[in-house]
Design a protein with these regions (language model features):
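A surface/extracellular/periplasmic glyco- and lipid-processing/surface-interacting theme
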Residues: 1-218
Length: 218
């Protein structure tokens, strides 16, 4: 749902029954590993099922073969951010589904970015080191049980609106997230309804359900 407005290709290896039915309904650019095995591989130095890899080159070739060459979308407003003199949010904690997935961010003024940790340890990319987004967004979202909840899954409510917290430049701002329907872009607006400009570079977004998860900072 969040990827739909970007006309993005969805690269995945299987998924929940509901997610698969949505991705395969013809409204998405589905590049499932199950049907495009030559564009993915399994590494022997990691445990299955978390050992499937691909590459930008292979996905570019696959997209080109399928005619997925261009996308039209409305992006977030962007700005050239710089650290504030008196930061008020240099440590951010986002509690999600449990201790193995809870994340924290430590603000680094020198790079004006946030050093990400997960499960109490630095969250690293094997190639590039610790993940350091320029902006972190935490959104309050609801969940709902399936009408036919035979598989035990719940759906995150990706449309509608709710509260959001935007961390950048060492500060936090309260905003409203909104998404009118599945094909509409996700919007982040301030109390006057104006789009909030996000720093250029990486933005990491976390969605949590109040009562089950939380966000805090200091």
């Amino acid at each position: 749902s969040w990827a739909a407005p970007y006309q993005a290709s969805i690269a995945h290896v299987g998924g929940s029954p509901n997610a698969l039915s949505q991705v395969r309904n013809g409204n998405y650019r589905d590049i499932d590993q199950f049907f495009n095995d030559g564009s993915y591989w399994r590494s022997r130095d990691r445990y299955a099922p978390h050992n499937v890899y691909t590459s930008g080159e292979k996905l570019d070739q696959l997209n080109s073969a399928k005619g997925y060459n261009n996308s039209e979308f409305t992006s977030f407003a962007r700005a050239d951010g710089k650290p504030v003199e008196s930061p008020n949010a240099t440590s951010v904690n986002i509690n999600l589904s449990g201790s193995l997935y809870n994340t924290s961010y430590a603000y680094d003024k020198a790079s004006n970015s946030y050093l990400r940790s997960m499960a109490g340890a630095p969250h690293t990319d094997r190639e590039d080191g610790q993940i350091t987004p320029n902006t972190v967004v935490a959104m309050e979202v609801g969940v709902e049980a399936r009408a036919q909840n035979y598989d035990g899954y719940e759906d995150v409510k990706t449309t509608g609106s709710g509260k959001a917290y935007i961390f950048q430049n060492g500060t936090v701002a309260t905003a409203t997230w909104s998404k009118a329907d599945i094909n509409s872009p996700l919007k982040l607006t301030d109390e006057s309804g104006k789009d909030v400009a996000l720093n250029r570079g990486q933005t990491w977004i976390a969605a949590f359900t109040p009562g089950r998860g939380s966000v805090s900072w200091q």
